[in-house]
Regions:
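Short, structured helix-loop boundary elements
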Residues: 67, 123-126, 214, 218
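Glycine-rich loops and low-complexity Gly/Arg-rich segments
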Residues: 93-97, 120-125, 191-196
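Surface/interface recognition patches
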Residues: 136-137, 145-148, 192-196, 200
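The conserved 3'-phosphoadenosine-5'-phosphosulfate
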Residues: 101-104, 154-247
Length: 247
C-alpha cells in the first residue's frame, strides 16, 4: 500500500510540472491538493499501527461542524476478519454500506484499470484487457480481482462482525435512482442531493466488452449472480439482463 502511495506522489508531481508549464491554474491547485493529501495519508499509515489514532487524525483533518465522515474504497473487500473486527473496535461510531455492482461490469472495469496501468508502449489496450480477462478465469490468476467482486464472501465476513444497524448492503446502480439514493443518505444520516447531480468520478478508459468472452465470463460469475438473486429483491435491470443470458 505504501509503495503504491509513493508511486502516486511521483506521478502527481510529474503532472504538476506539466500543469505549471501550461499555466493551468485549476490543474495546479487540484494536483497540489492531491499531492498534499497523498503525503498525509502515507505519513499516517507509516506510523506504528498499534492503534489507528494517526489514521483517525488524518480522516478528521479540516473537520468543522460536519457530523459524518465518509471513507470510500473498494479495498475494504480485501479485509480479513481480524481487520474487520478492528474497524468495529474504533473509538467512533462506524456504519458501513457495501454497494454491489453488476459482476460482469465490475470485473470489466477492474480489468480495464489494470490494463491501463500495465500498458506498454505500442501495446494494444483492448488486447491487454482480453489477456488479463483470460488470465482471471482460465488460469485463475489476478485473484485479487475475483476477491474484490466476491459479493457472497465479502458480505459474509462483514455480517459476522456488524449487526444490521451498522452494516447495509445495496446496489451501486441505486446511486442513479432518486428514492433509493435518498434511502442511502438517510442511512448515512446526511441530506440527500438530487441523484441527477451525481457525476461519475474516476471513470476508466472506455472499451467494448469482447463478445467472444461474454458467455464464459458470465458462467464464471454465475455463483455471484445466483447469490444476489436469491438474497436480494429487485435486481437492477443490467443485472437481470446479464443473468438472463445464463439461462
Amino acid at each position: 500500500q505504501l509503495k503504491i502511495l509513493n508511486r502516486l506522489v511521483v506521478q502527481y508531481e510529474a503532472r504538476l510540472i506539466e500543469a505549471e508549464a501550461a499555466d493551468n491554474i485549476i490543474r495546479i491547485v487540484s494536483l497540489s491538493l492531491r499531492i498534499a493529501d497523498t503525503k498525509a495519508i502515507t505519513m499516517a499509515l507509516s506510523i506504528d499501527r498499534g492503534d489507528d489514532s494517526a489514521y483517525l487524525k488524518y480522516l478528521q483533518a479540516g473537520r468543522m461542524d460536519e457530523t459524518v465522515l465518509l471513507d470510500v474504497t473498494p479495498a475494504y473487500a480485501l479485509l480479513k476478519p481480524a481487520e474487520i473486527a478492528r474497524i468495529s473496535a474504533l473509538p467512533i461510531r462506524v456504519k458501513l454500506q457495501y454497494l454491489m455492482r453488476d459482476p460482469l461490469e465490475r470485473l470489466w472495469s477492474n480489468v480495464r484499470m489494470l490494463a491501463k496501468r500495465s500498458l506498454n508502449e505500442g501495446q494494444d489496450f483492448l488486447v491487454n484487457c482480453q489477456d488479463i480477462l483470460q488470465r482471471v478465469f482460465y488460469t485463475q490468476e489476478e485473484t485479487h480481482i475475483v476477491t474484490r467482486g466476491d459479493h457472497r464472501s465479502n458480505i459474509a465476513r462483514f455480517v459476522a462482525v456488524f449487526d444490521r444497524s451498522q452494516f447495509q448492503v445495496g446496489f451501486a446502480e441505486s446511486l442513479q435512482d432518486g428514492p433509493k439514493f435518498d434511502s442511502m443518505c438517510a442511512y448515512w444520516g446526511i441530506n440527500a442531493t438530487s441523484a441527477r447531480q451525481i457525476k461519475p468520478a474516476h471513470v476508466g478508459v472506455a472499451a467494448p466488452f469482447p463478445e467472444g468472452l461474454r458467455r464464459d465470463t458470465l458462467q464464471f460469475l454465475k455463483t455471484q449472480y445466483d447469490f444476489v438473486a436469491d438474497n436480494f429483491a429487485d435486481l437492477p435491470e443490467n443485472w437481470r439482463k446479464n443473468r438472463e443470458l445464463l439461462a
